[in-house]
Amino acid sequence: MAGKPKLHYFNGRGRMEPIRWLLAAAGVEFEEKFIGSAEDLGKLRNDGSLMFQQVPMVEIDGMKLVQTRAILNYIASKYNLYGKDIKERALIDMYTEGMADLNEMILLLPLCRPEEKDAKIALIKEKTKSRYFPAFEKVLQSHGQDYLVGNKLSRADISLVELLYYVEELDSSLISNFPLLKALKTRISNLPTVKKFLQPGSPRKPPADAKALEEARKIFRF
C-alpha cells in the first residue's frame, strides 16, 4: 500500500494551498514537511528533489512532482476529478486557468508595496465583478446543473470554491449578485471531505499575515 502523499512547502498558503484543497476534497490524507529555513530549501535543491529548484513539491506514487499545475492535474486524474473525456478536460482546464489568473492577483497582494495595496485591491474587486464571477455564473446558468462540467464534481468546482473563499476574505459582498455561485459554494462546502477541511485544526492555512510573509522572505530570499 502506497504511503500518504508528502507535501514540501513552507507553513503557509502560497502555491501549495490549491493542492491541499484538491487532496482534501478527494478525501486523501497527506503529510506536510514544512520548509522552515533557507537551509531546508537548499537541502532539497542539493539532493536533487526539485527538478527546477522550486517548490511546491509533492512526493506521491514514487514520484517527486513539481510545478503546481502538473501536480493538480495528476491528483485530479488519479482521483477522477478531471472529467470523463478530452472535451470535459478541455473545459476544466479553461475554467481553472481563468481562476488561476484571478487567484494569482490575490496571491501576490501581500507582496505589493503599501502605497499600491488599495489600488491592487480595487483592481481585483473590479475584475471579480466584471470578468470572472459573471463568466462562471453564466456557465452554471447555461446548463442548469449542480457542477461546472459534466454535472459531476471536478477540480474546477474545487478551485472555484477555494477562490470564492479568498474573494470573500477581501469583500464578502462581491458574491451577492451571483446566486448560482453562492449555491455552488454552499453545495461544495457541505461535501463531507470539504466540510472537514474547512473546520479549525485542518491543514487549511490562514491568510498570510506579516509574520508568515517575513518567514517566507527568509526562506525564499525575495
Swiss-Prot record:
Entries under CDD domains matching the protein: GST_C_Alpha, GST_N_Alpha
A Pfam family assignment: GST_C
Domain GST C-terminal: start-end pairs: 85-207
Cited InterPro entries: Glutathione-S-Trfase_C-like, Glutathione-S-Trfase_C_sf, Glutathione_S-Trfase, Glutathione_S-Trfase_N, GST_alpha, GST_C, GST_superfamily, Thioredoxin-like_sf
Binding, glutathione: Y9, R45, Q54, V55, Q67, T68
GO molecular function: glutathione transferase activity
Enzyme class label: transferase
PTM annotation (N-acetylalanine): residues: A2
Keywords linked to the UniProt accession: Acetylation, Cytoplasm, Lipid metabolism, Transferase
Modification N6-succinyllysine occurs at: K4
EC number: 2.5.1.18
The keyword Cytoplasm appears for this protein: yes
Single GO cellular component term: extracellular exosome
GO biological process, one term: xenobiotic metabolic process
Catalytic activity: RX + glutathione = an S-substituted glutathione + a halide anion + H(+); androst-5-ene-3,17-dione = androst-4-ene-3,17-dione; pregn-5-ene-3,20-dione = progesterone
Disulfide cross-links: none
The GST N-terminal domain, residue ranges: 3-83
Protein's cellular compartments: Cytoplasm
Protein family membership: Belongs to the GST superfamily. Alpha family.
Subunit structure of this chain's protein: Homodimer.
Role played: Conjugation of reduced glutathione to a wide number of exogenous and endogenous hydrophobic electrophiles. Catalyzes isomerization reactions that contribute to the biosynthesis of steroid hormones. Efficiently catalyze obligatory double-bond isomerizations of delta(5)-androstene-3,17-dione and delta(5)-pregnene-3,20-dione, precursors to testosterone and progesterone, respectively. Has substantial activity toward aflatoxin B1-8,9-epoxide.
Protein name: Glutathione S-transferase A3
Gene name for this UniProt entry: GSTA3
